[in-house]
Amino acid sequence: MASSSSAASLFATECLLYSTASSSTLVGSMGLTTVAAPSSTSALFTFKGVSDPAFHSVTVIPTSPNPAISGTGGLIFQLESNKAALNIFSWQRDHLLQRIILPSKLSCIACSPNGDLVAGGSFDGRILLWQIATGDLLASFDAHYRSVTVLKWTCDGAGLLTGSEDARILVWSLAGLLAPHDQTSSSITSSEHNPAPYCTLADHNLAITDLDISSGRFPHQAMVLSSSSDASVKLWDLRTRSLLSTFVFEQPIHRVVLDCTERFFFAATAPTSSDNLVYRIDLFRKRDASSRMVETKQATTGSQFDFVTDELRGASSVEAHGFGSAAGPTTERIPSARDVAHRAESNGSSIISIREPISSMCLSTNSTSLLVGSVAGNLFVIDVSNSQVVRTVSLLGNAKVSAISDKNAVTNLMVLPKPRDLLGHWETLSSSGTGSSMSGSGGVGGAGAPVGIPVRPIASSFGHHVLASEEDRLSKPYLTRISGNKTTLAFDEHNVDSFIDPEWDSHLVSSELLGRSTSALLSPSQTQSGAPPSTSAIHAQAALEAERLQRENKLLRSQLHQAKAINDEMWSRLVQDRLSVNQVDSE
């Protein structure tokens, strides 16, 4: 029987990527350690040349796990604080891989899950989107009225969420960001325009501090958790674009993280709060025993008796909480630790006290450990099962206590599998003989020099301007998958959920309507015959319909251009006449 250690070796070690801010006595740092035994003095990896990473300024492109093609190495993007520069690191070396000058200073950054795109938010509310391999600036537009505080991609990379100090959350579909000219007719007469958001979530009153997204597909299966300085956390449904529930706290909330199975979430108070607390809010709670176990019934004779309900016989005694109701969004007040009376009545929340102000927070992959970073550079490891702090570690290395201040905050925490291309890892070594190159594997062949897994291509520079003309924008297409797990999409398959359509919802359309949408493409003779249409006939009718729509679209465009030319000529003549009249009057 294989031992537990050998079984554990089949899975990647769970690692923690952390960053700390700079102060007058200590420089900022960024490193990788294990979640099971975190340490900064004996970390797995420490990066050199890190420049004061701020909050939401570090993002990771994971190493490709495909062994058939050797995969591609992972990348780490880090914004320089107060500079329009982006530092790029690789797991295969500890020093800087590339430094890119940006068009402006950015406040936050986020890479898409597939590693093809990187989005940035500026201090003036602008959103920028680059393609990493080519450096093309695919989108650049004013989205918010104030600084962008956080960017989050959905798990499938089909949606981007932006939070700002203007108290709004904007949700963008990738299709709308890449092709905004297809959304409005104003693009015909203007080369510069903003894409339309999929939806706007505007129920907060103060700045958005953090966002977390569930693991569902965008938009039909995704939920969003948002925190704000207005001391509230809100749960949103992207499919219906609606607010599900609001949780009101006593202090402003700085960080929020949702369990991977959506059972609960954690909310951490802001560093400026009087109490350093982490709240656990359960989204599934046990029902009251008095209402679910015994009920009173009245017999036909008039006497009353008690009997055991189905819940006590083994049926579910847990109910969902916080996902809204038939009457609309729900609101729940979360009592503080000082409110003893209400804390005793609250069975859906618990409080974890931290001895230092909280700056960052994340959950382990399986939600067994909660990792909390403080403003003093310490990491608190909390057991989720009992809400106890099991370990406290300093992430400032061998720094003296006198040199540590409240400015050395842990700014970013991310849990990820141990990278395959990590420097010193056995997969970055190649064998010169027939034996194995794994350390301690007992291979007879000698190990050759380390050979790194190929790093994904990065442009030498990022574009500062979006291509103005529509022809130039379309000459460099960006490929994106629009059809679920299938590589091809047949016309007669009504898998509408696989498309990103902000107005379409298959749950609101009957099968009869779907059948009529297919018959609308058929000729009257085919419809009256009653015979099932063939695939070729459907494709032929669809091609004719598409050709007709293209002709009509071309005609409308030409008419619009003519109308615009007439309008411009009338305007110019009016201005010239007015100027000539003013000139005569002045003489």
Curated annotation (Swiss-Prot):
Q: Name one GO cellular component term.
A: rixosome complex
Task: Give a single Pfam family match.
Answer: WD40
Q: Does the keyword rRNA processing apply?
A: yes
The GO biological-process annotations, alphabetized, read as: DNA-templated DNA replication; rRNA processing
Cross-referenced InterPro entries: G-protein_beta_WD-40_rep, WD40/YVTN_repeat-like_dom_sf, WD40_repeat_CS, WD40_repeat_dom_sf, WD40_rpt, WDR18/Ipi3/RID3
Q: Where in the cell is it found?
A: Nucleus
UniProt keyword annotation of Repeat present: yes
Signal peptide residue numbers: none
Gene3D superfamilies documented for this protein: YVTN repeat-like/Quinoprotein amine dehydrogenase (2.130.10.10)
Q: Which UniProt keywords apply?
A: Nucleus, Repeat, Ribosome biogenesis, rRNA processing, WD repeat
Q: Where are the WD repeats?
A: 101-142, 144-182, 203-246, 353-392
Quaternary structure, per UniProt, is:
Component of the RIX1 complex, composed of IPI1, RIX1/IPI2 and IPI3 in a 1:2:2 stoichiometry. The complex interacts (via RIX1) with MDN1 (via its hexameric AAA ATPase ring) and the pre-60S ribosome particles.
Q: Which family does it belong to?
A: Belongs to the WD repeat IPI3/WDR18 family.
Q: What job does this protein perform?
A: Component of the RIX1 complex required for processing of ITS2 sequences from 35S pre-rRNA.
Would you tell me the protein name for this molecule? Answer: Pre-rRNA-processing protein IPI3
Lineage of producing organism: Eukaryota, Fungi, Dikarya, Basidiomycota, Ustilaginomycotina
